[in-house]
């Protein structure tokens, strides 16, 4: 009987060991810029607490056109199953705390100056105390991935040659004026705990990858990881400043995070590229978070089949989403087959009316924008901006001709909770360059569904009035369901 009980107990312990969650943390290397505003600890359920180092990362604070650099914090870890997190604010008393995106419903408890919560899935979060969004903690809770000790392990795991692995293990690397170029059939591996001061470029390459949970930070005005004139590229896991994709095809960006603080700090640009996908990405930027442009910066052509799924956008200036504007007026280029799905927009703070719009399509240069879907997008209360800015326009600062038209745009399950959004704009340009086929389905403003048959709407009112959307000239077939 005792032997049987011992066996059962042993099997239970083995079962717990097999199925218990795991946590992997990465000590920050000497030389990397750190921030002591927060102390972060994490543990698997019932496990030992581990400290997570916090890096210093600049963000942009705008005020009436003036830009001030603020110092926020960044921390990351990998885990499986479920983890408990403690975030302690070291700079004073904590009166209020929240974890965003709010849609993730992260329940918190406050013990003194420590914010406590649990996670059961990978998330990119902002921990904010006392309403301060500029000295916050960006916390990236990653899904666990294999940790490779050397280039040989990477090569074996990916079925490639060791000489084609550019390996950066834990440590600090200052590239000076140099950069990392990733060529065809090569992999750049940036391990957790690695900090590269510099930038990397996938240039005229095919079947290339940039992977790993480490940091690539130029620490100056520069794109961190670029994909240029390339095909069949994967970027998976890093933290950096910007990830533009230009003149490329079949590019996948996933589990990547970008934070910028300088002028022209767009997060994830698409220039004249096709078949580009983004999944589980985070952008906090000092310019547009996500853009889709045609001819621009020596990249030539239109864009089709662009997909963004599971993203967090935070625009400290300019747009969370911006489409159109730039093209070659002689080519009548097209942007089409675009989907944004499952997006949290945490901020827009833009004083200039021309550049407001959490979701903006401002097409110029004879571009036609058509066949797009924006679905399951949640917008927090923004500081300054508008929800929708769809205009066939002629922006003489950046364009050489008006846009060709905006057609067949579906916006489904879009919600906004707040009071600071300005009047939205939907306008065409003339009888030939129109805006048409804009279909809102289940648009909700502060919980109220806006639709053509909504109760209490006088028959002579436009439905758009209840969403504070101005529908201007040369705009046709705008519906609310």
Regions found by a protein language model. Give the residues of each.
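Right-handed parallel beta-helix
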Residues: 185-187, 192, 206-217, 231-241, ...
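Extracellular "leader-to-stem" segments immediately downstream of a signal peptide or signal-anchor
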Residues: 2, 20-184, 195-209, 215-220, ...
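Extracellular beta-rich repeat passengers
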Residues: 349-481
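Bacterial N-terminal signal peptides
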Residues: 8-17
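Extracellular beta-strand/beta-solenoid scaffold signature
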Residues: 219-226, 240-242, 262-269, 285-299, ...
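Bacterial N-terminal signal peptides that target proteins for export
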Residues: 1-9
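Extracellular beta-strand-rich solenoid/capping regions of secreted or surface-exposed proteins
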Residues: 117-119, 173-187, 195-211, 217-234, ...
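Non-cytosolic beta-sheet module surface loops
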Residues: 89, 119, 281-282, 312, ...
């Amino acid at each position: 009987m005792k032997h049987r009980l011992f066996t059962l107990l042993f099997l239970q312990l083995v079962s717990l060991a097999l199925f218990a969650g795991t946590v992997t943390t990465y000590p920050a290397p000497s030389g990397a810029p750190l921030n002591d505003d927060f102390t972060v600890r994490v543990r698997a359920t019932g496990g030992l607490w581990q400290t997570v180092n916090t890096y210093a990362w600049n963000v942009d604070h705008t005020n009436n056109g003036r830009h001030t650099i603020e110092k926020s914090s960044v921390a990351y870890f990998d885990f499986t199953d479920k983890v408990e997190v403690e975030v302690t604010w070291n700079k004073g008393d904590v009166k209020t705390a929240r974890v965003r995106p709010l849609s993730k419903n992260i329940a918190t408890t406050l013990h003194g100056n420590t914010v406590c919560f649990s996670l059961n899935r990978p998330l990119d979060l902002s921990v904010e105390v006392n309403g301060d969004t500029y000295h916050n903690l960006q916390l990236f809770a990653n899904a666990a991935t294999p940790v490779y000790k050397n280039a040989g392990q990477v090569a074996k795991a990916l079925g490639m040659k060791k000489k084609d692995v550019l390996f950066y293990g834990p440590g600090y690397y200052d590239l000076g004026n140099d950069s990392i170029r990733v060529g065809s059939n090569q992999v750049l591996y940036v391990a957790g705990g690695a900090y590269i001061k510099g930038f990397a470029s996938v240039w005229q390459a095919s079947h290339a990858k940039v992977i790993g949970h480490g940091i690539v930070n130029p620490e100056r005005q520069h794109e961190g990881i670029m994909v240029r004139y390339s095909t069949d590229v994967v970027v998976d896991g890093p933290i950096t400043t910007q990830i533009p994709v230009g003149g490329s095809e079949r590019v996948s960006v996933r589990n990547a995070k970008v934070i910028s603080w300088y002028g022209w700090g767009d997060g994830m640009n698409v220039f004249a590229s096709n078949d580009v996908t983004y999944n589980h990405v985070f952008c906090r930027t000092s310019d547009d978070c996500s853009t889709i442009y045609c001819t621009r910066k020596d990249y030539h052509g239109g864009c089709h089949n662009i997909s963004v799924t599971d993203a967090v956008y935070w625009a400290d200036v300019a747009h969370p989403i911006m489409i159109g504007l730039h093209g070659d007026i002689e080519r009548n280029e097209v942007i089409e087959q675009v989907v944004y799905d499952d997006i949290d927009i945490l901020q827009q703070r833009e004083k200039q009316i021309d550049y407001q719009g959490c979701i903006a399509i401002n097409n110029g240069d004879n571009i036609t924008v058509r066949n797009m879907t924006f679905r399951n997008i949640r917008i927090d209360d923004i500081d300054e901006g508008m929800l929708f800015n769809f205009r066939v326009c002629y922006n003489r600062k950046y364009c050489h001709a008006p846009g060709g038209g905006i057609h067949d745009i579906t916006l489904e399950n879009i919600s906004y909770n707040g009071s600071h959004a300005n009047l939205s704009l939907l306008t065409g340009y003339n009888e030939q360059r129109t805006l048409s086929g804009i279909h809102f389905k289940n648009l909700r403003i502060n919980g109220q569904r806006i639709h053509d048959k909504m109760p209490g709407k006088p028959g002579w009112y436009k439905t758009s009035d209840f969403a504070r959307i101005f529908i201007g000239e040369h705009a046709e077939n705008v519906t609310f369901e």
